[in-house]
């Protein structure tokens, strides 16, 4: 690979090396970096902060803060601080002593390359290790074409540049304008999805087996986010192409590269990228803000956590689309029928994706008369989790150890009981990324659908008219929401109960308890008021409420939004709202349903 490189070094405010323009071949024979191999250690993040922390320009002051150091509050920047990670590592160390180095390799790269890869608790790390997946790791990564992506087998540049420093690698070549005050190398690899795949395909030491216990000849894929993208339409060059960075590091126009140029009003003509690296783990970011933010250890400013939370909200808002076809009216004597729901995955990977333990997405369907819930499926019960009704529609991947059928033990898992997560558009067949179970059917082009369609039906019931003298409020409010929870109460309790090594699991349980009840993330929502017929009139002298023997007959008011005819009303447009922060069974499906 021949790259264009310019570098200069400033020490003590004096320019000691002029800008150098030349051809730079880069390191040869790249291979995964192992503990103790680096001659030139990773520079601490605080050094990067000196130049790369700056406010938005006056023209963009009303936009989310774009400084790259806001990365610190992302889950990438918090990967080594994540208390759920360390609680899981402790249990993994019980299950497979000596095999947790790969966990540290991904979540705490500085600890790994520094020889602290045997750590099983956050207390065993050095302060600089806590910066997680940080500036120097990404900006010194070099492409290793021989090693397959995955399992954090990163190759870190350790070759000094012309200025006596290991160059920082990035997509700007500085043929025009002021170059940075550190060595740099123009390298497009940092903008490719394969770089993200370094850590976002993960296998364990177990071999995967099928439902009968027979080996499938491949390692157990704990997560395959990169492979999901690679097999989707998003990875194909063309109008639908999107890299990981396009979604998780959105482009911004007219941005400075450092604080000095920002203060001088200089901008980089080709713009830059946000470094928010947004995912969906909002509750964890809230927890980390309490522990490490301004009111806690003051390791990361609250303003950066606020940037991270806002970025998560925007990411969730674009993740999925709901389409609902509802009946024109509901007759309580007949029940709620013909409620059809379609969920479309707009992301470039399964929805949800990544680490699957303790994570579930589902549909909540509610039919209310006033404040009374008449029909429901997928209700979340505080402190317990999902109610578990027969029509509950979930999207999750559940793994177990085949021999014992024990769940949640990451390094013992070797088979998938189910993987009902929604595939990305155009996902090709492949053992490593196929759904597990009978939820989805291949489309005509032999790809998996990026949607799930399901129909709900509820039987007739009796409800007393709260205002028999007023037919204007004889209305049922129908609502459908796509909800998501990471770290379910069941999983958090598992982390606390199963840990015999240290108190990391109990600490996690206490931290989450301090946040209060779990509020599921809302990825998409739909609602519509329809006329309600068949309400029971209370007998004279009785109070309103559930119908009983004293009710004397139905009322037939039209209600708000009434319409004639009994056919379904398509309601997939204006009332579908985007995300706000804050069982495998189902009825009939079509296309992607089942």
PLM regions and their residue ranges:
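Bacterial N-terminal signal peptides that target proteins for export
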Residues: 2-16
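Cleavable N-terminal signal peptides
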Residues: 16-18, 28
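Ser/Thr-rich, Pro/Gly/Ala-heavy low-complexity intrinsically disordered linkers and tails
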Residues: 28-30, 536-594
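N-terminal module-boundary/linker segments of secreted carbohydrate-active enzymes
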Residues: 30-61
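Primarily the internal scaffold of c-type cytochrome electron-transfer domains
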Residues: 31-32, 55-89, 119-450, 454-468, ...
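Residues immediately within or flanking Cys/His clusters that coordinate Zn2+
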Residues: 41-46, 96, 100, 132, ...
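Conserved, well-structured interaction surfaces
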Residues: 100, 105-117
